C-alpha cells in the first residue's frame, strides 16, 4: 500500500472504505477517455443541486445580514459590498439551475466523461474564486469593521460559523480539484489558485507532501474506469450535502442570534 494519502482514501476520514484505501495510480493515462453513462450524468446533476443549495445558503444568510446592517448607518459601504456579492451569487445560482444536462448530452453512452465534467468544473472554479473573495471579506475585514464602527460585536459572525464557512469552502474546492485531476484533465484554465498557492508555499517550507493533513496537498488519484468515478462522485455528493447542511445550520444560528439581540434592544427602549 502506498504511504501517501489521497483524496480517495482520506478526506477528513469521511471516505472510510477499503475500496478507497487500496487504490494505486494506473500505469497508463486513460482517464480522459472514459465514457459517460446515464448514471454518472445523474450524479453530475446531483452535484449541481448540492452546489445550488450551497449558494442559496449564502444568498439567504447575506440577505438577512444586509437587513440587520441597515440598523448601523456607519456600515453603509460594507452593506453595499454585500449587496453586490448577493447579486453575483444569485446570477450564478440561476445559471446553474438553468443548465440542462439532457439537452447538452442527449446520448450519454456515446460521450466521453471529461466532456460532461469540463463545463461543470469550469463553472465551479469561477464560482469558487468569487466565494474565496467573499469569504475573506465576510470573515476578516468586515468583522473588524463592525467592531471598529459600531463599538460592539452584536453583528459579528460566531467563531463556529466562520469555521463552518472555511471548512465547507475547502471541501468544495477539493471536490472541484478531484473532478479535474481524477480524469487527468490538464489545462491551465482548470488550475485552482488556492491549491496552487498552498502547494507553492508547502514546497518552499519543505513540507512533506507524501504525509500531510492539509486537504489541498493530499494527492488525487486518477480513476481507472467510469464505475470508480461514479462511486467516488456519489460519495462526494453526500459529503458536500452534509457540509452544506452544517453551514446552513450555523448561518441560521447567527440570524436567530442577531434577531434576538435587536428584539431585546427594542424591548429595552
Curated annotation (Swiss-Prot):
Keywords, comma-separated and alphabetical: Cytoplasm, mRNA transport, Nucleus, RNA-binding, Transport
Pfam families (alphabetical): She2p
One example GO MF annotation: RNA binding
SUPFAM superfamilies on file: RNA-binding protein She2p
InterPro entries xrefs: RNA-bd_She2, She2_dom_sf
Keyword NAD: no
GO biological process: mRNA transport
Name used for this protein in its record: SWI5-dependent HO expression protein 2
Gene3D superfamilies hit by this protein: She2 domain (1.20.200.20)
Assembly and binders: Homodimer and homotetramer.
Compartmental location: Cytoplasm; Nucleus
Family: Belongs to the SHE2 family.
Function: RNA-binding protein that binds specific mRNAs including the ASH1 mRNA, coding for a repressor of the HO endonuclease. Part of the mRNA localization machinery that restricts accumulation of certain proteins to the bud and in the daughter cell.
GO cellular component: cytoplasm; nucleus
Amino acid at each position: 500500500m502506498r504511504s501517501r494519502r489521497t483524496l480517495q482514501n482520506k478526506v477528513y476520514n469521511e471516505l472510510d472504505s477499503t475500496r478507497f484505501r487500496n487504490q494505486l495510480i494506473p500505469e497508463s493515462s486513460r482517464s480522459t477517455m472514459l465514457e459517460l453513462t446515464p448514471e454518472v450524468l445523474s450524479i453530475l446533476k446531483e452535484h449541481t443541486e448540492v452546489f445550488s443549495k450551497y449558494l442559496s445558503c449564502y444568498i439567504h444568510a447575506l440577505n438577512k445580514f444586509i437587513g440587520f446592517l441597515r440598523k448601523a448607518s456607519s456600515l453603509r459601504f460594507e452593506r453595499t459590498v454585500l449587496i453586490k456579492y448577493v447579486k453575483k451569487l444569485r446570477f450564478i445560482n440561476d445559471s446553474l439551475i438553468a443548465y440542462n444536462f439532457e439537452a447538452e448530452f442527449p446520448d450519454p453512452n456515446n460521450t466521453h466523461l471529461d466532456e460532461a465534467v469540463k463545463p461543470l468544473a469550469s463553472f465551479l472554479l469561477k464560482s469558487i474564486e468569487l466565494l474565496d473573495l467573499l469569504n475573506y471579506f465576510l470573515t476578516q475585514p468586515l468583522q473588524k469593521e463592525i467592531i471598529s464602527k459600531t463599538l460592539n460585536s452584536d453583528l459579528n459572525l460566531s467563531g463556529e460559523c466562520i469555521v463552518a464557512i472555511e471548512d465547507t469552502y475547502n471541501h468544495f474546492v477539493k471536490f472541484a480539484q478531484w473532478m479535474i485531476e481524477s480524469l487527468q484533465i490538464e489545462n491551465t484554465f482548470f488550475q485552482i489558485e488556492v491549491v496552487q498557492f498552498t502547494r507553492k508555499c508547502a514546497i518552499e517550507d519543505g513540507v512533506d507532501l507524501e504525509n500531510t493533513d492539509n486537504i489541498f496537498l493530499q494527492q488525487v488519484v486518477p480513476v481507472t474506469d467510469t464505475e470508480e468515478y461514479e462511486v467516488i462522485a456519489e460519495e462526494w455528493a453526500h459529503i458536500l450535502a452534509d457540509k452544506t447542511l452544517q453551514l446552513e445550520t450555523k448561518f441560521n444560528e447567527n440570524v436567530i442570534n442577531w434577531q434576538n439581540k435587536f428584539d431585546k434592544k427594542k424591548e429595552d427602549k
